[in-house]
Amino acid sequence: MTATSSPRPKQISTDPCISLQNVTISYNEFEAVRHVYCEIPRGKITALIGPSGCGKSTILRSLNRMNDLIEGCSLTGRVMFDGDDLYSPNIDPVEVRRRIGMVFQQPNPFPKSIYENIAFGARINGYKGDMNELVERSLRQAAVWDECKDKLKESGCSLSGGQQQRLCIARTIAIEPEVILMDEPCSALDPISTLKIEETMHELKNRFTIVIVTHNMQQAVRVSDFTAFFNAEVQEGGSGKVGYLVEFNETEKIFHSPAQEATQNYISGRFG
């Protein structure tokens, strides 16, 4: 299978939350990922896996227009969310990022108190309810309330790495998104903190659609319902590699009976 001949995948979900339709993303003249068709199921966890440089983080950032912040980045095709093309001129990217939140690879709490890490974003987004209740609910949903409830006035930066990442998840939850994107959220964490994040993700999927990029295939098996495998190949002329979607299916099928040889080779460790 080549990047220029990737077939349109079969429909996986009858209730897609986000649909990528022939999406190609470029940085100036360089194509990073090409011709992606994919439907992200609602209320599930979808993992994006593949070797470094295959475009999975680029695709993840396209789902809430974070790539807009990168100079020279452009997208063709359509990213549909609840019937709207997110790249339509009349769509406000700030509102897109409120409805589709992001948790980054490195924990990045605000240099504020734990309380204000949660309250600040909600406040600037016009939240009018009981702020104390929102802070507690968000921290509980991110499974960090018990560790923070007695030190809400302390800096969020004083927490451990795993606690900081769960604080960032709580901060994302507080603005009441419909989708949460996670870009390798456990790569900087120890195994115990990773387990807590994964347990939190399982709880959150009852309320949110989650899309996660991970290099850890065991993590993809543990947490995701669906998996998209991306690969990359050298472009004509040898000017770099372009990423493309090889296969998208239920996680169990991807890891136990993949349809593509490249998927089997990757999950068995023959490359990557």
Curated annotation (Swiss-Prot):
Name the Enzyme Commission number(s) assigned to this protein: 7.3.2.1
Assembly: The complex is composed of two ATP-binding proteins (PstB), two transmembrane proteins (PstC and PstA) and a solute-binding protein (PstS).
- List the Pfam families hit by this protein, alphabetically: ABC_tran (PF00005)
**EC class name:** translocase
What subcellular compartments does it reside in? Cell inner membrane
Task: Indicate yes or no for the key word ATP-binding.
Answer: yes
Which UniProt keyword terms apply here? ATP-binding, Cell inner membrane, Cell membrane, Membrane, Nucleotide-binding, Phosphate transport, Translocase, Transport
Outline what the protein does.
Part of the ABC transporter complex PstSACB involved in phosphate import. Responsible for energy coupling to the transport system.
Give all residue intervals belonging to the ABC transporter domain: 18-256
Q: Name one GO biological process term.
A: phosphate ion transmembrane transport
Name of the coding gene? pstB
GO CC annotation = plasma membrane
What is the recorded name of this protein?
Phosphate import ATP-binding protein PstB
Reactions catalysed, semicolon-separated, are: phosphate(out) + ATP + H2O = ADP + 2 phosphate(in) + H(+)
CDD domains given in the database record: ABC_PstB_phosphate_transporter (cd03260)
Annotated ATP binding lies at G50, P51, S52, G53, C54, G55, K56, S57
Return the NCBIfam families for the record.
3a0107s01c2
Q: Which family does it belong to?
A: Belongs to the ABC transporter superfamily. Phosphate importer (TC 3.A.1.7) family.
User: Membrane topology per the record?
Assistant: Peripheral membrane protein
Intrachain disulfide bonds: none
The UniProt GO MF terms for this protein read: ATP binding; ATP hydrolysis activity; ATPase-coupled phosphate ion transmembrane transporter activity
Chief subcellular location equals: membrane
